Amino acid sequence: MLIIETLPLLRQQIRRLRMEGKRVALVPTMGNLHDGHMKLVDEAKARADVVVVSIFVNPMQFDRPEDLARYPRTLQEDCEKLNKRKVDLVFAPSVKEIYPNGTETHTYVDVPGLSTMLEGASRPGHFRGVSTIVSKLFNLVQPDIACFGEKDFQQLALIRKMVADMGFDIEIVGVPIMRAKDGLALSSRNGYLTAEQRKIAPGLYKVLSSIADKLQAGERDLDEIIAIAGQELNEKGFRADDIQIRDADTLLEVSETSKRAVILVAAWLGDARLIDNKIVELA
């Protein structure tokens, strides 16, 4: 497994792979890898000749400096996991390598609408940071496919739109959420939970599933469903942050023509902001 930290070396390797006619898959990450990331790697390996995993804690997508400062940096452990998975190349640049003149004056990519709604409304600048770094990685790695987790549902929708709008010749693969046996979606943020909070955490998925059951049973008073769900979360020990029921294909309000709904839930548990989602077919 090759570990590359600089842009010139990455470009050199990508040129070589292209000359050899290899099909390249990219898995963008911020490190602190868990089994959910490994599922992305496995999907990439099944679809391509060469797998490139990027590990970069992107300062542009953090709206709170304290969150950036405390995000775990576990490069050595991450590389050991990826080596066992027989990943071909790890791109682990420094912030200086990606943003040589800092982030304030760096050219950015913005996806109107999707970047400022829902999660974007509560995290200003977050999705602009995501679309900027992902587009830069696409330009550097020139992958044939790129794999993203469906846990970050809005992020996946945003990247799909960016790829379509910008004309990137890249297949975007959404990989289903990987869950612990008790239903909790795997996430790097789970590491912020205490042992006691970890016992409470599966309650998020239970509330999510309860909303899904109501929708499948034909209930359509969304305001009431959301209000009850928020109360249930708070009673379980969470601080409900945002609960939305949207059209799964547009992320707009559910309408009579909507065929699928996506339930998007975000809640605080201690210092961890947990997110999850579930898609429901509407009769």
Swiss-Prot record:
Protein's UniProt keywords contain Cytoplasm: yes
GO cellular component terms attached to this protein's record: cytosol
GO terms for MF: ATP binding; pantoate-beta-alanine ligase activity
Predominant cellular place of this UniProt entry's protein: cytoplasm
Residues binding (R)-pantoate, per UniProt: 61, 155
Enzyme nomenclature, EC number: 6.3.2.1
Pathway: Cofactor biosynthesis; (R)-pantothenate biosynthesis; (R)-pantothenate from (R)-pantoate and beta-alanine: step 1/1
Record-level GO BP terms: pantothenate biosynthetic process
Pfam (any one): Pantoate_ligase
The reaction(s) this protein catalyses: (R)-pantoate + beta-alanine + ATP = (R)-pantothenate + AMP + diphosphate + H(+)
Location(s) in or outside the cell: Cytoplasm
Presence of keyword ATP-binding: yes
Binding site for ATP: 30-37, 149-152, 186-189
Binding-site positions, beta-alanine: 61
UniProt cross-references to InterPro entries, sorted A to Z: Cyt_trans-like (IPR004821), Pantoate_ligase (IPR003721), Pantoate_ligase_C (IPR042176), Rossmann-like_a/b/a_fold (IPR014729)
Keywords: ATP-binding, Cytoplasm, Ligase, Nucleotide-binding, Pantothenate biosynthesis
Active-site residues per Swiss-Prot or TrEMBL entry: 37 (proton donor)
Subunit organization: Homodimer.
PANTHER family reported in the protein's UniProt record: CYTIDYLATE KINASE/PANTOATE-BETA-ALANINE LIGASE (PTHR21299), PANTOATE--BETA-ALANINE LIGASE (PTHR21299:SF1)
Summary of the function given for this chain in its UniProt record: Catalyzes the condensation of pantoate with beta-alanine in an ATP-dependent reaction via a pantoyl-adenylate intermediate.
Homology family: Belongs to the pantothenate synthetase family.
HAMAP family tied to this protein: PanC
Note from the entry: The reaction proceeds by a bi uni uni bi ping pong mechanism.
Protein name per Swiss-Prot or TrEMBL: Pantothenate synthetase
Organism: Shigella boydii serotype 18 (strain CDC 3083-94 / BS512)
Gene coding for it: panC
